[in-house]
């Protein structure tokens, strides 16, 4: 039962925090290419890790995470107006690199597929040449 509650809260916080970042945060380091990928709230509901996916350079990613962490109080105040909780959790923004890892895996799988196709093409050419 508690797990379902935290899952629902995580999902709700993800949507609300995403909306607050998109609408209310006015920081040049926080671009529109910022996506809240997931939220993990602690069991006591006092702390929440907010995982962010950012498209851009490594420096831009670091600057964006720093800007979001410095604006965490502002984001929490605005988000708390949309979510009824006894205590709104303290937000800690983290870079979610799972999207980058996924893209890297896709790239490697593409290379493997091309390599297999070229090997199969070479093998079929050799079979056709032998009488």
From Swiss-Prot:
Any one GO molecular-function label of the UniProt entry: ribosomal small subunit binding
UniProt signal peptide: none
One of the GO BP terms on file: maturation of SSU-rRNA
HAMAP family recorded: RbfA (MF_00003)
Subcellular location, record wording: Cytoplasm
Subunit structure: Monomer. Binds 30S ribosomal subunits, but not 50S ribosomal subunits or 70S ribosomes.
Predominant localisation class: cytoplasm
GO cellular component: cytosol
Pfam family, one: RBFA
PROSITE patterns xrefs: RBFA
Main function: One of several proteins that assist in the late maturation steps of the functional core of the 30S ribosomal subunit. Associates with free 30S ribosomal subunits (but not with 30S subunits that are part of 70S ribosomes or polysomes). Required for efficient processing of 16S rRNA. May interact with the 5'-terminal helix region of 16S rRNA.
Gene3D superfamilies: 3.30.300.20
Disulfide bonds: none
Phylogenetic lineage: Bacteria, Pseudomonadati, Chlamydiota, Chlamydiia, Parachlamydiales
Keyword terms: Cytoplasm, Ribosome biogenesis
Name recorded for this polypeptide: Ribosome-binding factor A
Superkingdom classification of source: Bacteria
């Amino acid at each position: 039962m508690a797990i379902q509650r935290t899952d629902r809260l995580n999902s709700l916080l993800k949507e609300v925090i995403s909306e607050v970042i998109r609408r209310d945060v006015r920081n040049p380091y926080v671009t529109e290419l910022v996506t809240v990928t997931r939220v993990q709230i602690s069991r006591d509901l006092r702390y929440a890790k907010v995982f962010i996916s950012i498209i851009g350079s490594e420096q831009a990613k670091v600057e964006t995470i720093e800007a979001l962490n410095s604006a965490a109080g502002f984001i929490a105040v605005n988000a708390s107006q949309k979510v009824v909780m006894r205590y709104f959790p303290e937000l800690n923004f983290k870079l979610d690199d799972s999207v980058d890892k996924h893209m890297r895996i896709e790239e490697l799988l593409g290379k493997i597929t091309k390599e297999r196709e070229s090997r199969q093409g070479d093998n079929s050419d050799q079979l056709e040449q032998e009488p």
